[in-house]
UniProtKB/Swiss-Prot annotation:
GO annotation, cellular component aspect: cytoplasm
This protein's name: Malate dehydrogenase
Keyword Zinc: no
Species the sequence originates in: Escherichia coli (strain SMS-3-5 / SECEC)
Listed PROSITE patterns: MDH (PS00068)
Any matching Pfam family: Ldh_1_N
Organism lineage string: Bacteria, Pseudomonadati, Pseudomonadota, Gammaproteobacteria, Enterobacterales
Single GO molecular function: L-malate dehydrogenase (NAD+) activity
């Protein structure tokens, strides 16, 4: 199993690469790519960690050598948020980066599963889909927007509030991956109940958690370490499913049946071909139904922006 990380010299990429080097199954290959000249050195640094994961780093304009034979490609390349920016302000720079990298994936490893981490995910996934479609290699079961950070944050905040072990809590999060499009389904967390006020406050905190980190870092960056952990969790789940493990479920942002929007984050059963089954979002509370209806315009606009970027 070969995993490629594109954007591997950045804050998320390095954290992700470290976690994959220590946690991928023995015999896996890990390939790091970034435009930055430091990238082969990041791979050398990680190669000193004693795990049975082969690692190589590549830099420069051409990602092809890193992508050859990849089964999973995780893309975190792009610029990070600064205070006062929201994820959509990143669009102007990151759209071009994602388009270029996905074009290279389409040429070199068209059958790979692709996880898009680069923000704004609501839009960059639509860009990736249109690029793959133009190249004639789009498979909607193999393209994912990685929203796992919303899930791990929800798990952490709920566990803190309710005095639970964080490992015992699993909150499904649906919709998209910015602002109001992030909808944690708190009504579906087993064995925990919330007041209306708690639901409103928690939902808001989960939606704004990225900003909490950007502000706390005081201009020095955005959420890189928790995002690295979230991306590793998703990537490792995907690898396990591709290798035939049964019953692997993760939420991610994928093209579905279009009931809510063309792309939508929901629980997915993963398998040897990527998405095996898009699972139902279940029964929503009145608060959640309302929030779902309220986000769809924003989500659809974000998606249209990505489609237009490629097709203009």
């Amino acid at each position: 199993m070969k995993v490629a990380v594109l954007g591997a010299a950045g804050g998320i990429g390095q954290a992700l690469a470290l976690l994959l080097k220590t946690q991928l199954p023995s015999g896996s290959e890990l390939s790091l790519y970034d435009i930055a000249p430091v990238t082969p050195g990041v791979a050398v640094d990680l190669s000193h960690i004693p795990t049975a994961v082969k690692i190589k780093g590549f830099s420069g304009e051409d990602a092809t050598p890193a992508l050859e034979g990849a089964d999973v490609v995780l893309i975190s390349a792009g610029v990070a948020r600064k205070p006062g920016m929201d994820r959509s302000d990143l669009f102007n720079v990151n759209a071009g980066i994602v388009k270029n990298l996905v074009q290279q994936v389409a040429k070199t490893c068209p059958k790979a599963c692709i996880g898009i981490i680069t923000n704004p995910v609501n839009t960059t996934v639509a860009i990736a889909a249109e690029v793959l479609k133009k190249a004639g290699v789009y498979d909607k079961n193999k393209l994912f927007g990685v929203t796992t950070l919303d899930i791990i944050r929800s798990n952490t905040f709920v566990a803190e509030l309710k005095g639970k072990q964080p490992g015992e809590v699993e909150v499904p999060v649906i919709g998209g991956h910015s602002g109001v499009t992030i909808l944690p389904l708190l009504s579906q967390v087993p064995g925990v109940s919330f007041t209306e006020q708690e639901v409103a406050d928690l939902t808001k905190r989960i939606q704004n958690a990225g900003t909490e980190v950007v502000e706390a870092k005081a201009g020095g960056g955005s959420a890189t370490l928790s995002m690295g952990q979230a991306a590793a969790r998703f990537g490792l789940s995907l690898v396990r499913a591709l290798q035939g493990e049964q019953g692997v479920v993760e939420c991610a942002y994928v093209e579905g049946d279009g009931q809510y929007a063309r792309f939508f984050s929901q629980p997915l059963l993963l398998g040897k071909n990527g998405v095996e089954e898009r699972k139902s979002i279940g029964t929503l509370s009145a608060f959640e139904k309302n929030a779902l209806e309220g986000m769809l315009d924003t989500l659809k606009k974000d998606i249209a922006l990505g489609e237009e970027f490629v097709n203009k």
